[in-house]
Amino acid sequence: MSYFLVNEALPKDMRAALARYGECISLPPFDKLPHPVNKHPDMLMMQIGETVFVHREYEAGQRILERLGVPYHLSEKAVGENYPADVALNCFAAGGYFFGKLSATSEEVKAYAKEQGLVLQSVSQGYTKCSCAVAGRAVVTADVGIFRAAKEAGLSVLLVPPRHIGIEMYDAGFLGGASVTLDEKTLGFFGDLGRHPAGEEIRAFFEEAGINVVCLSGDPLFDYGGAIKID
């Protein structure tokens, strides 16, 4: 049985679409982070492979993982409402590399990434995971710095226009926060990719990389902070 740890605000239609791939479980807000991203999965936890990291003070998330029987590692880095104290877990691994704003990234996560043989690559954008839709070695982002770093790392990467993604309370969301890994070869989007100006280009890019694309609703893309998939 697979599970998706999701933003509690994720709409019912998207939950129903996700239910074909696994059960949705809402993550409670974490009061150390700013509203509304305090309920975004990509701000609350991160994964390297099957290994999950969670903020030490985010006990509600830890209880959910324990209930599911999922082992996890704690991030000891202090969390705060102001950037970059909110991005300790906003990082990702792809193609043998680990990307994040390393000065703000959890020490436990960086140490584990090194143990796994990943090459650490620092970028300026602290919301690294938020900024990228990732599947295998394929990365799509609107952030020029991440685009250059991923390209230098030899990954397959596509640069798209910024904005055009909704988010609660802010001017624009991120593509990574509007996407979710459904399985090893399938990437889902919270909304209709065809309503994004680079939507068809994004779809073609992932399909060329052998990744199927699934739109989880007919609405414009919306950043719910992605999801943590537990198998």
Role assignments for model-derived ranges:
Residues 1-231:
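Histidine/cysteine-enriched polar flanking segments
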